[in-house]
A protein has these predicted regions:
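C-terminal beta-strand-loop-alpha-helix "lid" module of Rossmann-like NAD(P)-dependent dehydrogenases
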Residues: 146-166
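A generic local structural motif
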Residues: 1-2, 96-97, 118
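Conserved Rossmann-fold NAD(P)-dependent oxidoreductase catalytic core, especially the SDR/UDP-sugar
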Residues: 13-17, 24-32, 36-112, 123, ...
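Amphipathic, well-packed alpha-helical segments that form the structural scaffold of globular domains
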Residues: 12-19, 161-165
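Conserved Rossmann-fold cofactor-binding substructure of NAD(P)-dependent oxidoreductases
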Residues: 1-13
């Protein structure tokens, strides 16, 4: 197994593709997966001695309120660090009450937290080079890098499996 020391000393290209893509998560759940998870990877990247670039895989839908999505940085409607602190300290009931106002037109907590995550990643651009990719769709892998690497029936995967089964 690779340990943190080996990563810090040897990684020069880091792809961060992990996220919870469920659309029905509470704000706390989506924040814990998408924001805190990315923040932990960014903190590790900060220590990497040979890092040339940090590539964050986002989604084309994290700025779905825009008429046209350009290849540029979009500031989030809220400070991602502030949202992380708020989620840590507020009760689930309070968060449930304020979530619709925070989403501010976003369709779900996934899109909202992915937009915040882009802002979080951007906040590290003075520490190391970053790139943000916004694919419109992500599907499960069949064999590579190993079977089951991407699990779940989210997005088009369920549709494809359903169509294949008839």
């Amino acid at each position: 197994p690779i340990d943190e020391k080996e990563l810090i000393e040897n990684v020069d290209l880091l792809f961060h593709c992990a996220a919870n893509v469920r659309f029905d998560l509470t704000l706390k759940e989506a924040t814990n997966f998408n924001l805190y998870g990315t923040h932990r990877v960014l903190k590790l990247a900060e220590k990497m001695q040979k890092l040339q670039v940090f590539v964050h895989v986002s989604t084309a839908y994290c700025h779905c309120t825009e008429q046209e999505l350009e290849e540029r940085y979009y500031p989030a409607s809220e400070n991602p660090f502030g949202v992380m602190e708020m989620v840590k300290h507020l009760s689930d009931d309070t968060l449930k009450l304020i979530t619709p106002k925070l989403l501010n037109g976003m369709p779900n907590t996934y899109a909202y937290t992915k937009g915040l995550t882009e802002d979080l990643v951007h906040s590290y651009h003075t520490k190391f080079p970053i790139a943000i990719a916004r694919p419109s769709i992500v599907v499960a892998s069949w064999k590579e890098p190993l079977p089951g690497f991407v699990e779940g029936m989210n997005g088009p995967t369920g549709l494809i499996i359903g169509a294949a089964k008839g």
